């Protein structure tokens, strides 16, 4: 089993449940979701590392958040995750902690269940462009 690739991920308890995660073969990963999915903060993309032990994948990513109403309120978020890979799906959980830039905890831990499905462009049909 191999986690490397692009995944559609649902984190039910997150401010916006739908995410895209990319796992690279060098043990790095990326996480992204729509900026305005979270109405309270603007969040950067998440960037982190992962490792596998059999079918169990664990890791963490870093993101920065800024309060939409008080732009001077900046936090560093660290999201840890662990899930079990089953072919082209995974199930597990994540926990997020948010800190001031000096390292003082501000929020968390915030937990959520994770489910993921491998993205394969061959399984999606894209409508042909109209020739008007």
How does the language model describe each region?
Residues 11, 63-65, 96:
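Short beta-strand segments enriched in hydrophobic/aromatic residues
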Residues 16-58, 63-67:
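N-terminal glycine/threonine-rich, aromatic-flanked beta-hairpin/loop signature
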Residues 11, 24, 100:
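Acidic surface patches and DE-rich sequence motifs
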Residues 54, 96-132:
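Edge beta-strand at a domain terminus
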Residues 37-41, 66-73, 98-108:
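Short, cysteine-centered beta-strand-loop-beta hairpins and adjacent loop/turn segments enriched
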Residues 61-89:
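Acidic, glycine-rich flexible loop segments
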Residues 1-16, 46-48:
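Tryptophan-anchored aromatic micro-motifs
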Residues 19-22, 46-52, 76-85, 95-96, ...:
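Hydrophobic/aromatic beta-strand elements that line small-molecule binding cavities or substrate pockets
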């Amino acid at each position: 089993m191999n986690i490397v690739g692009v995944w559609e991920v649902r984190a039910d308890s997150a401010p916006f449940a739908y995410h895209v995660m990319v796992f690279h073969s060098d043990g790095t990963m990326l996480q992204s979701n729509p900026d305005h999915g979270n109405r309270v903060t603007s969040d950067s993309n998440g960037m982190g590392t992962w490792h596998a032990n059999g079918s169990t994948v664990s890791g963490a990513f870093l993101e920065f958040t800024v309060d939409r109403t008080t732009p001077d309120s900046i936090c560093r978020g660290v999201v840890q995750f662990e899930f079990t890979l089953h072919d082209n799906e995974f199930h597990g959980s994540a926990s997020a902690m948010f800190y001031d830039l000096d390292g003082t905890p501000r929020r968390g831990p915030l937990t959520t269940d994770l489910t993921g499905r491998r993205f394969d462009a061959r399984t999606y049909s894209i409508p042909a462009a109209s020739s008007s």
